[in-house]
From Swiss-Prot:
Taxonomic superkingdom: Bacteria
Entry's family note: Belongs to the YqgF nuclease family.
Gene3D superfamilies: YqgF/RNase H-like domain
Broad enzyme group: hydrolase
Species of provenance: Synechococcus sp. (strain JA-3-3Ab)
GO biological process: rRNA 5'-end processing
HAMAP family per record: Nuclease_YqgF
GO terms under cellular component: cytosol
Protein's UniProt name: Putative pre-16S rRNA nuclease
InterPro entries for the chain: RNaseH-like_sf (IPR012337), YqgF (IPR005227), YqgF/RNaseH-like_dom (IPR006641), YqgF/RNaseH-like_dom_sf (IPR037027)
Keywords (A to Z) from UniProt: Cytoplasm, Hydrolase, Nuclease, Ribosome biogenesis
Record bears the keyword Cytoplasm: yes
Length: 159
């Protein structure tokens, strides 16, 4: 069995935008052109649903995104709570406003992972507050990218 190291590099250009939708802020992350790595990009301060959607659309244009990935904060048992319902409403509004796929992933514990990542990177606790939303978006997007890559590789024929 051989490994095709050029597999990812031969695909069409790819740009995913990841969102961590909270009550006050929306963390924004983006993927590299190969769909391998997610990086936190910034934060949208929430104002109103139409303004929030317009800000996301601006990020989509800026990044030339081909897909938007939104984290849904499911409860520990996988059920939908009040915060998840709020995010689902946001997702429906976004889907109506953009002409590209908007997919959701379970973001359970993404903030915990983001805090750990920032600590491991040596970011002081005071500085973490400003970065946590975009890092959570990066965790959400990275989860989706990894799942996408693994599902594609499991479908690839063995050589």
């Amino acid at each position: 069995m051989s490994t095709d190291l050029n597999y990812s590099a031969t695909r069409d250009p790819f740009s995913a935008l990841g969102l961590d939708v909270g009550n006050r802020r929306i963390g924004v992350a983006g993927s590299d052109g190969l769909g391998l790595l997610a990086t936190g990009l910034g934060v949208i301060r929430r104002r109103s649903l139409p303004e929030d959607i317009a800000q996301v659309q601006a990020w989509i244009r800026r990044r030339q995104a081909t897909v938007v990935v939104v984290g849904i904060p499911l409860l520990a048992d996988g059920s939908v709570g009040s915060q998840a319902r709020k995010v689902q409403r946001f997702v429906r509004a976004l889907q109506a406003a953009v002409d590209l796929p908007v997919v959701t992933v379970n973001e359970y514990l993404s903030t915990v992972q983001a805090e750990w990542d920032l600590r491991q990177a040596g970011i002081p606790a005071k500085a973490q507050k400003a970065l946590i939303d975009q890092q959570s978006a990066a965790v959400i997007l990275q989860t989706w990218l990894d799942e996408r890559r693994y599902s594609q590789s499991s479908k690839a024929p063995c050589r």
